[in-house]
């Protein structure tokens, strides 16, 4: 039975547009003999593949990415183009050490390029299983030496790992946790990351400085720094930390987020144990601790994070208590209170009292409100179950102020001149901290607001 042709359209006079008439006639015959679907390669079907690839050279990465979604056939031809030497040379920019342009404009441009490239690979490999996607992408990216763990001779001046991280973040955005687990395992196998981490955390701190630096740069630039959602950052940080015992987790956390030398980027292990440090040196560690504490996952309980903070405070040896206090303050009220409450519950009241003294000292130095320390102490007092325990704790706080002042005074009397100047300034701040602390306690006791 012949097919019926729909004639509900405007007729065009034959003498005009003869080419259109021939196309209509041809189209009618096609319908009459059974409908044939248009090629998924569209109008590009008439072109040799060489011409199609030449056209791709004139398109931006974003445009090629959009084009890859037209059909499976087009996507496959784009994959083939990427695999060619000319395609990979054009798409895999390797200008990672160009410091000529001001205001880091070059950095921004190449990062945006690899963000777009990640989206292109995400779309082109959409129909492949995760394992096959990763194998194909690795095959293409293996040409870029600066993407490798030890690939760049000047890693501190290189944007390679940062671009690689931007690429991976765009590629894996929206993937479920199982797929992201596979990505992490693939990267670990590719770089032998677990073995390298084991060597770093089991060695004497600072004895493998180059390895520590490589681990820090790879973990930060590739796995952690590009995520916009905290839950994603927590997921990847958990993958890095969780395979290891708590003591190694603390060492690894310090390697990744601890203070580094501005000259060579190497981890500074002695900073926390030799002298008071600043907020900048501790901010990375504090942010990582908050990230794990706030993570809505069963993999990190509050007790886990507090234990990690406790372990961190003795890496590589016991920190100055002022640095420990500063880290707790930067980590936020919840973590600070939980840490102090843990000491109260475990009967470590003398340690807790000294910590209160140094919280007050940090408040004084940084011009924070001293009533924060007093209110934190008041909150911790409620953890003690009996009035006798509370009274004993408060007595320990008063004694701790006196003891720390005497320790600083002895340090001044026995030290050299330069040391004297720093110690005297620290003593000056502590005496003022004690005065302001007790002033706040008096206001609280007399129930008199400070503003009156």
Swiss-Prot record:
Q: Does the keyword Calcium apply?
A: no
Origin superkingdom: Eukaryota
Residue ranges that the Swiss-Prot or TrEMBL entry lists as coiled coil: none
What range(s) does the F-box domain occupy? 41-91
Q: Which Pfam families match?
A: ARM_FBXO47, F-box
Q: Which UniProt keywords apply?
A: Ubl conjugation pathway
Q: Which InterPro entries match?
A: ARM_FBXO47, F-box-like_dom_sf, F-box_dom, FBXO47
| Function according to Swiss-Prot or TrEMBL | Probably recognizes and binds to some phosphorylated proteins and promotes their ubiquitination and degradation.
Q: How does it assemble?
A: Part of a SCF (SKP1-cullin-F-box) protein ligase complex.
Give the protein name, as stated in the record.
F-box only protein 47
